[in-house]
């Protein structure tokens, strides 16, 4: 019954064309639209705008910019601290943000961080992490003093790898919570949201009460929401009435003592025009997607089913100089800068995505939210990019050299203002078609795609500047 919203995607985009005025306008729009909603909405100030110094995003959001937000009653703290190398090296701006938010909740983002580096990260003030992919990693971070959010979204699914460890060592459960970290409305419709995580944990052997605590009181305590998360005197009457606790079959929902009518019509607010028309691409042409190597070797982003981590590979495709052409094993990926029309385009190769006979593209690509596209031919990839320029953002799928469908996301290229049903139908249709075109069932076509541009998750990513090695902190050059 409450959501803790890290607004970094909005700030990444809004700042580029409207400064703090645009960010403020967005905040006012959301809070006003949610005022009558049966949901408590809280905000984390974005810590990582940009996520790293070598990102090509729309803005900087400094500690000085944060001061006007810090004491707002709905602001709980600092959003996930993405660039842990900056914390370890005590980079000036991130240390100012950590100091500003001392005493508040500070979320983390530390995939694979361990040992002395983990201790230094925690000692800097970071309190949570949601990037654990194994119980061993989660346990080490918990013992270092962190609270752990076990993630189960559309792309990254970690409950099955972590919960069995908690069942064996239940003394750690009080320090664990659940999150989704990007989940398609299509998957929410089919599976549920946090209730799906609870349901899955119970099936993996966790006591139902422990699983429910991870979804309720543990989260409320972590984020300092003292009147939420329990059924007791002095707590807000946010309740679920279940038909079956084992299967988490929800009969009724109460928010602040009021029963929620699940059949009531949802009113979609008209978004201010100032929050639209934010996709600004330089002179883009199909030739910008050409990828050649002087020695015939290429770096490859190997995608993994059920994860958003990648594996770094280098493959020899030619005996000498050559231009890459996609095949059954390797497809092309590109990221096109869309905030300031710089004309920058990074091009690379992926394996494991599998799409054949077309291309898929999105203006949602963490964290800078440039346009990202994967395809098996340059013409369809270019068509996908042009389609998103035309719609000023969205998800699109190209099949057989034609636009199969597009879900427009006109609000900063990140969100739809057309309502749930419209978005759900469009997205479902494209996801099903993408799987028909070869995308494996273990990969969420649009969400997994969106994480390929996030240069703080190992091992290898792509930005408008090119292929980036997260482990070495270097861009590859051909």
Report residues per predicted region.
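A generic structural signal for well-ordered alpha-helical segments
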Residues: 2-3, 34, 98-101, 121, ...
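Short, ordered loop/turn segments at secondary-structure junctions
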Residues: 14-18, 46-47, 83, 111-112, ...
């Amino acid at each position: 019954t409450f959501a803790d919203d890290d607004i970094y995607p909005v700030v990444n985009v809004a700042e580029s064309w409207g400064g703090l005025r645009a960010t403020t306008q967005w905040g006012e729009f959301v809070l006003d639209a949610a005022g009558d909603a049966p949901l408590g909405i809280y905000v984390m100030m974005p810590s990582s705008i940009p996520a790293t110094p070598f990102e090509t995003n729309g803005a900087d959001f400094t500690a000085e910019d944060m001061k006007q937000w810090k004491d707002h009653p709905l602001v709980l703290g600092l959003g996930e601290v993405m660039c842990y190398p900056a914390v370890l090296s005590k980079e000036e701006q991130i240390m100012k943000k950590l100091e500003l938010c001392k005493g508040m909740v500070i979320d983390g983002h530390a995939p694979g961080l361990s040992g002395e580096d983990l201790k230094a990260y925690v000692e800097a003030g970071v309190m949570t992490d949601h990037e654990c992919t194994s119980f061993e990693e989660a346990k080490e971070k918990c013992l270092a003093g962190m609270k752990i959010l076990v993630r189960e979204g559309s792309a990254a699914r970690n409950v099955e790898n972590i919960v069995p460890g908690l069942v064996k060592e239940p003394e750690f459960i009080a320090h664990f919570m659940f999150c989704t970290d990007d989940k398609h409305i299509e998957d929410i419709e089919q599976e549920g949201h946090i209730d799906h995580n609870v349901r899955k944990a119970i099936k993996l052997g966790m006591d139902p009460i422990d699983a429910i605590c991870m979804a309720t009181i543990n989260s409320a305590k972590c984020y300092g929401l003292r009147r939420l998360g329990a059924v007791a005197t002095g707590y807000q009457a946010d309740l679920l009435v279940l038909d079956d606790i084992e299967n988490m079959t929800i009969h009724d929902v109460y928010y602040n003592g009021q029963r929620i009518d699940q059949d009531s019509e949802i009113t979609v607010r008209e978004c201010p025009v100032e929050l639209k028309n934010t996709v600004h691409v330089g002179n883009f042409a199909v030739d910008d997607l050409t990828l050649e190597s002087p020695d015939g070797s290429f770096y490859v982003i190997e995608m993994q089913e059920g994860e958003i981590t990648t594996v770094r590979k280098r493959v020899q495709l030619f005996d000498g100089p050559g231009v890459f052409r996609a095949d059954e094993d390797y497809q092309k990926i590109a990221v096109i800068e869309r905030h300031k029309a710089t004309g920058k385009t990074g091009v690379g190769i992926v394996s494991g995505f599998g799409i054949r006979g077309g291309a898929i593209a999105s203006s949602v690509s963490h964290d800078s939210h440039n346009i990202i596209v994967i395809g098996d031919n340059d013409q369809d990839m270019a068509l996908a990019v042009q389609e998103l320029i035309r719609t000023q953002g969205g998800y699109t799928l190209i099949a057989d050299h034609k636009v199969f469908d597009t879900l427009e996301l006109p609000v900063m290229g990140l969100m739809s203002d057309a309502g749930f049903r419209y978005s759900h139908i469009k997205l479902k249709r494209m996801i099903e078609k993408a799987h028909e075109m070869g995308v494996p069932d273990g990969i969420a076509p649009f969400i997994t795609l969106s994480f390929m541009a996030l240069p703080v998750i190992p091992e290898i990513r792509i930005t408008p500047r090119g292929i980036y090695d997260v482990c070495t902190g270097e861009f590859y050059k051909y």
